[in-house]
């Protein structure tokens, strides 16, 4: 990373999830120009709820797809919505870090809270659901073309 001037975020929930979690603390490693910063974040510190692990358990692929559609359409609140907000924010922070490494000078919690607000606005405005439908349409077209 140091020789390429690259930046990265790596994170893990203390519950063992390979993502930021809403069940307790998550650890984030932020790599910028070869320097590694380590941060612990808790969902309450970021403005989302803390939940029991059973509240974020998935199911069958069809069930999970339905839940994803409901979350992105703004039809579901609670643990699943909050974990989606948290991880969407992490993706946005990672993008910001990759395109502007100087953003690492601001506290990670502040950046996450700001991006949670962006993710929340995307869901609440319908933009997230609209983007999902666009992705589904393109995916179906590509699949149909590959079978032709």
List where the protein language model places each region:
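Glycine-rich anion-binding loops and their surrounding alpha/beta cores
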Residues: 1-148
């Amino acid at each position: 990373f140091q020789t390429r001037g690259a930046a990265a975020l790596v994170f893990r929930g203390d519950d063992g999830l390979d993502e930021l979690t809403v069940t307790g603390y998550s650890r984030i490693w932020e790599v910028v120009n070869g320097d590694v910063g380590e941060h612990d974040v808790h969902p309450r510190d970021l403005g989302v709820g803390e939940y029991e692990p059973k509240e974020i358990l998935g199911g069958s692929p069809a069930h999970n797809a339905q839940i994803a559609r409901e979350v992105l359409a703004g039809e579901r609140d609670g643990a699943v919505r909050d974990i989606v907000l948290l991880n969407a924010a992490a993706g946005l922070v990672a993008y910001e870090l990759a395109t502007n490494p100087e953003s690492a000078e601001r506290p990670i919690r502040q950046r996450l809270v700001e991006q949670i607000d962006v993710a929340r606005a995307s869901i609440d405005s319908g933009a997230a659901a609209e983007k999902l439908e666009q992705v589904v349409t393109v995916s179906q077209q590509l699949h149909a073309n590959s079978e032709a």
